[in-house]
Amino acid sequence: MRAGAVVCYPTDTLWGLGADPSRPEALRRLAEVKGRPEGMPVSVAFSSLEEIEPWALLSAPDRAVLRVHLPGPYTFLLRSSPRARQRWAPGVLGPGGRLGVRVPDHPGARAFLTATGPLTSTSANRHGSPPVRDLPEARRTFGSRVAAYVAASPAPRGVPSTVVDRWANEREPVRRF
C-alpha cells in the first residue's frame, strides 16, 4: 500500500477500491483505475471509531451519532482535523475540508484496515458504471490495474452506503462520494 497501489476489498455495502490516502500517486492511480477525473473527493475507511479521532474534529454530538451508527453502512461527512489537511493527499478532502469517514460492518474489511491503516473507500466500478457485484467481476473489470484483491466473507450487500452530512446546516454544496 505504501507504494501507491490500489486494492479491491469487500465492505458491508459494496466492493471498494482502497489506496493510501497520504500518497498523491495513490490517489492519481485510483482515479486512473476508476477512469474518473482526478480531484474528486473520496471517503476514507477506518477499522474503528477510535481510529477516526486524529483525522476529524468531532463534537460531542458527532461522537454520539458515530457510536450509534458505526460500524455500519454509513459514510459521515465531518470536519477534517489539521492533521488530515497536512498529511492526506489532495483529493481526499471535499469542499471546505470535509472528510468522508466509514467503519464498515464487515469483519474481513476491518481486519484488513487494522493491518493497513486507513484506506480510501470508493465503490469498485469504472466511472459512470454500476459497482461490481462480486470478486470475479472485479477481476474482469480491473485486471492487473489493481494490485491485490482481498477475498473475505460475507459478500457485500450490494447497496451503497448512506451519506450523512454532519455539516447539514452549512451553505456549501455537498458532493456525494
Please annotate each region the language model reported.
Residues 1-177:
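Active-site-adjacent structural elements in enzyme catalytic cores
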